Amino acid sequence: MSKVNISTPLGDIVVRLYDETPSHRDNFLKLVKEGFYDGTLFHRVIKDFMIQGGDPESKDAPKGKALGTGDAGYTLPAEFNPSLLHKRGALCAARQGDQVNPERRSSGCQFYIVWGKTYSSGQLGQLAKQLQMQALQGEFNALVGERREQIMQMRRNRDQAGLLALQEELEALAHAAVAQKGLGRMSDEAKRVYSELGGTPFLDGQYTVFGEVEKGLDVVGKIQEVSTDANDRPLKDLKMTMTMVE
């Protein structure tokens, strides 16, 4: 079981890395051992949401500089796992948006730790419906992309009947894919976690969760409350150093 200590001016955070996400685990450990994160900042902090770090450009960055675009020169394939939740204290990989990153590949170095909030059963029920609709739309859009040439040809031929039939076919395939993959479904355990501990359930299946805080969750709580500028960068630099926990 791999653990890493993150030292900050507000205290230490110990994170445990999941074996269920081996690519993210091994990459994070490699960077820690290389000292990649030492001297970098928690450069993006949003109260009741999360704290983000890992941008190499944040080392010795002048006050007020906008951060968040630095990277390690590579990305990682997503390692989604329905049992690994965006609960409070979850360690997750940051990434670029779906528009430029439809495969939802992770940043090679930037990460965030979830804070979030607790949800009522009614809120979770409503959120589950929204997540399912998002999942359906995502699957449908992917199928449309695969049939783009066919669709363009039908449009050129003004084949309205064919287009309507194809739309119905793709909608059925999207529903089947969502059901098969279990997308947009919130388990009883997830509902319990988000109602009791809290987190950011709307990010499940969107970003890779690859670890969790084992010690120092109170430190995460302190960091998410600090004052920030218009770019969500803390007004006082929060430098980190990371070491392996034996």
Residue ranges and their predicted role:
Residues M1-E246:
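Cyclophilin-like peptidyl-prolyl cis-trans isomerases
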